[in-house]
């Protein structure tokens, strides 16, 4: 009879501790994505409004961005993160509420910068939205 192979005889993966990180907030018109990385850009945690349980037009609300930001922030707390630099990209409605949620979770925000790509008269933008 074949012997059952035992799995996992290797080393246990140790979670590293990171004191300073960067929170990348990508706020589009349809969704908000938050990725928390270390200074080198290695992802520690991420969350989106769609992945947090919001579907359809509810993804593009400030409350959905707040919930997604709290989810990503709590997942990154396992790494011992204390200070966060925030980089916001995009024109979406969840920009400000995502930053406020990071502050409410308990991170010390050291810097907030807008890294939205600005065209030097490049592609024609989509038609004006009709509500």
Swiss-Prot record:
GO terms for molecular function: rRNA binding; structural constituent of ribosome. InterPro entries: Ribosomal_uS11, Ribosomal_uS11_bac-type, Ribosomal_uS11_CS, Ribosomal_uS11_sf. Pfam families: Ribosomal_S11. Gene3D superfamilies: Ribosomal protein S11. GO terms for biological process: translation. Keywords: Ribonucleoprotein, Ribosomal protein, RNA-binding, rRNA-binding. Transmembrane segments: none annotated. It comes from the Bacteria. The keyword RNA-binding applies. The keyword rRNA-binding applies. GO terms for cellular component: ribonucleoprotein complex; ribosome. Located on the platform of the 30S subunit, it bridges several disparate RNA helices of the 16S rRNA. Forms part of the Shine-Dalgarno cleft in the 70S ribosome. Belongs to the universal ribosomal protein uS11 family. NCBIfam families: PRK05309.1 (NF003698), uS11_bact (TIGR03632). Part of the 30S ribosomal subunit. Interacts with proteins S7 and S18. Binds to IF-3. This is Small ribosomal subunit protein uS11. It comes from Halorhodospira halophila (strain DSM 244 / SL1). The gene is rpsK.
